[in-house]
Structures are given as C-alpha cells and as structure tokens.
C-alpha cells in the first residue's frame, strides 16, 4: 500500500527528530570535553604559576598567569556558547516531539493545555472542544495568552464566524498561507520558550496602559528631586571635608518627604511592572522574528501584520525601551539596592517619568500590535494542525448560481479528528434545503453519536479556518 501524505510527513519528522538527537548527543560529548579542558587549564595553570612564583620568577609568573587566564576565559566562552546552543536545540527538539505526538494523537506526550468552555455553551462539551483529550488540546500550540483565547473563540463562536472582525474565509486564507511556513512558526514559539516556558501574557502588558499615572506636574517634581539629591550630596561632602554643620539634612528631609507624599501614586505601579520586562522581551523576540521575515507569496499575512511591518519606526525599538524602563523599576524587588539608588538619585521618579512618556506614545499602537500577534498566533496553531495533516482538505463555500440550487452541506470521507487514523471510520454526508433533516439509525454502539460529533466538530474546524 502506497504511503499517504500524512505517512510521509510522519516519517520525515521522525528522521528529523532522530538526526537532532544525534546532534544533541554529539554536543553533550563536546561539552564534556570543554569541561575537561577548563579543569586541565585551571590545574596546570595553578601548579605551574605557583611553582614559578616559588622560584621568585615574578615577571615570568605574571606572564604565565595571564596566558593561562586568557586560555581559560577563551575556552569558557566557547563552552558557554555551546551550552547556549544545546539549550536552544533541546527546546527546538521538544517542539518537534510535541508536534510528532500531536500527529500520532499520542496524548500522554502532548503538552497539556487548560481550556474552559463559556458558561452554558450549547455544544462545546458535547463536541469535545474542551477537556484533556479535546480538539483545543490537540490544536493549541499558541505561545501567547491572546492567541490561546482567540483560537478558542474561533471554535466556540463558529456560529458567528466574523465575531473578531475577520470572516472565516479570510481566516482560512491566512491559515493556508501560514501552513508551509513551519520554520517561522517554530522560530516564534522557540523565541518565547528561550525566555520562559510560560505563555506571553498580553493582558499584563495591556493593564500597564490602561491605568494612568496620576501625578500632577511630574516633570517639575523630577527636576526638584534631582536638585534636592544633588544639593544633599554637595552639602554632605562639604560637611565631611570642612566639618561644617549638617546642612545636608535639610534637603534630604525635603527629598524623603516628597518621596513619601508621592509613594501612594507610585506604589500601585510597581505591582504592574514587576517582572513585566520578561513579557516585553517575549513580545520583542516574536516581533523581531516577523521583522526579519519576508512574505512574498503571503499577501494575507502581510495585511494582518500591517501594523507591525509598515511602521516608520520599528516596534521592537519602542518595546525594548519600555522593557528597559520596567527593568529599572523592578529594582524595587531588591530593597537594599533600591534604597541605595533612591538615596543618590530620584531613581523611581525618573523612571516613572520615562514610563509615562513611553506609555503616552504607545497607548494606541501597542494594543494593535498585541492584537496582531494574537491573530497570527491563533492562525499559526491551525496552520501547524494543517501542516501535520496534509491529507486533510480545505472546506469550500458553496455559491448558488440558479434559483433552483439549494444551500446545504456536502462532505465526502468525513472523519473524526480525535480518533486515530488506524481506527477512524469515514462517512459521506449531504444535507440540503431548509427544513430538511437526516434521521440517523442503527444498533447500540454502532457509532451514531460519534457520527453526529464528527459532523459538528468538523463544522467548528471549518468555520474557524482550519482543514477537515
């Protein structure tokens, strides 16, 4: 029997996984060799240098110490570079193994994803859209919370196929164009995994924009605080060098009083920006991957990514700036460092001022970027599903040309996507005309309920933009 397209895809992925595992094993051997070299250079350098110093050959000893130090640092640099690449390779291998498990419906090796159906949803539970072995668990390979919510919305609201502003035909075209771009999908997923295994949380980023910084005349306050800290340092040095009275206590008291008066407005901000730079780094890495990509044959992808790829100034520049500001404010997580910095300069006020300016500039653009990433992420999840199942077909919308044509549903060889191919039974279906129905009969355990679920779950997939 001639292998199908899915069989060939499965064999190709298996060969790729085995080749990657061999590369990983070779890298592990090389890493062990680097460790031995580092240990050997350290021990040899210590023994030879100490012996030379004991002979009072200090200049020779200094030269040898420098040579061994340079050699050790060089080997360490190459070793660290290798370990970084091995870590990247390990994450990439996990992505490929997860995809292979989804192709084989190997549920124990599929990454677990939790989805909850909307309350009183008419068909989500009956059609196995949610649950541990559900359709969403199978197709959800998203890297962002917005993408995860969007792909679920496309399935839950398949009876409202334009609920997110994109028609289901546009979604299908987008998914079609993304299907062959497996390298782009893997790069975006890998970019976020290198930073954290947790999904990119767009809601946290949006919350930073929605809450305004309510400090009047912030720029003037920052200037005054800088003047007070500078005056405190100058007067403190004057007192230290000349023994003058402690006049530095006066500007310091005013500065501390100003800080505590504003702490009520600043404190809620820390809860939103603490560790937010990690989420921004994920967003930057994904957008940077898109900025480096070209889409010569994907006009729909270009249209969806228009807000990111057609900006005069690259979004990554603004987001990196915002990430550095959030890192600066996250110093509050280290109390001693935070106290020392604010004693020397108005650290918090300075970064709050910079944050206020950046937020004002990104208040409109950043939600659009996140929305674009969410749409692309959700479509990429369906595209990965289509890539893993090349035998599946893309549904087509029927168009009536005469008044005698009746609208309906036609399917040939329709099977349940959650049943393994070896055990899957396919059926044909044709239902036309308003008010018409099909009566499904059969004995117990003959597959009547499975057939009805097959029709329903494939309708959800089709209207979400995926193949069936």
Residue ranges and their predicted role:
Residues 427-468:
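P-loop NTPase nucleotide-binding module
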Residues 2-436:
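Alpha-helical bundle segments enriched in helix-capping/polar residues
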């Amino acid at each position: 029997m001639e292998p199908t397209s899915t069989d060939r895809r499965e064999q190709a992925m298996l060969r790729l996984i085995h080749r990657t595992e061999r590369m990983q094993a070779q890298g592990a051997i090389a890493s062990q060799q680097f460790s031995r070299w580092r240990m050997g250079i350290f021990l040899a350098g210590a023994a030879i240098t100490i012996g030379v110093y004991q002979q009072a050959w200090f200049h020779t000893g200094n030269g040898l110490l420098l040579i061994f130090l340079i050699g050790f640092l060089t080997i360490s640099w190459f070793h660290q570079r290798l370990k970084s690449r091995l870590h990247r390779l390990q994450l990439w291998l996990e992505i490929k193994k997860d995809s292979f498990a989804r192709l084989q419906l190997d549920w124990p090796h599929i990454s677990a994803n939790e989805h909850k159906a909307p309350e009183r949803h008419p068909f989500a539970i009956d059609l196995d859209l949610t649950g541990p072995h559900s359709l969403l668990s199978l197709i959800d390979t998203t890297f962002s919370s917005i993408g995860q919510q969007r792909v679920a919305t496309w399935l839950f609201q398949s009876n409202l196929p334009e609920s997110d502003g994109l028609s289901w035909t546009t979604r299908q075209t987008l998914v079609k164009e993304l299907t062959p771009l497996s390298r782009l999908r893997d790069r975006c997923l890998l970019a976020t995994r290198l930073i954290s295994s947790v999904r990119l949380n767009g809601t946290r980023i949006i919350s930073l924009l929605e809450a305004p910084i309510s400090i009047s005349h912030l720029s003037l306050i920052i200037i005054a605080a800088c003047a007070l800290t500078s005056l405190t340092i100058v007067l403190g040095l004057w007192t230290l060098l000349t023994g003058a009275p402690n006049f530095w206590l006066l500007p310091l008291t005013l500065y501390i009083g100003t800080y505590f008066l504003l702490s009520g407005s600043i404190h809620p901000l820390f809860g939103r920006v603490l560790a937010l730079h990690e989420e921004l780094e994920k967003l930057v890495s994904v957008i940077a991957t898109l900025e480096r990509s070209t889409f010569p044959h994907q006009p729909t992808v270009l249209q969806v990514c228009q807000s990111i790829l057609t900006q005069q100034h690259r979004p990554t520049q603004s987001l990196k700036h915002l990430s550095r500001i959030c890192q600066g404010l996250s110093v509050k997580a280290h109390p001693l460092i935070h106290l020392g910095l604010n004693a020397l300069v108005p650290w918090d006020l300075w970064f709050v001022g910079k944050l206020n300016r950046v937020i004002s500039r990104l208040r409109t653009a950043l939600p659009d970027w996140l929305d674009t990433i969410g749409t692309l992420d959700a479509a990429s999840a369906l595209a990965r599903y289509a890539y893993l199942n090349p035998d599946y077909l893309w549904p087509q919308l029927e168009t009536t040309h005469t008044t005698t044509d009746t609208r309906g549903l036609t399917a040939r060889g329709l099977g349940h996507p959650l049943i393994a191919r070896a055990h899957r039974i396919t059926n044909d279906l044709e239902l036309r005309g308003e008010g018409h129905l099909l009566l499904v009969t059969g004995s117990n355990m003959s597959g009547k309920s499975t057939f009805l679920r097959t029709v329903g779950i494939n309708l959800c997939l089709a209207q979400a933009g995926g193949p069936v």
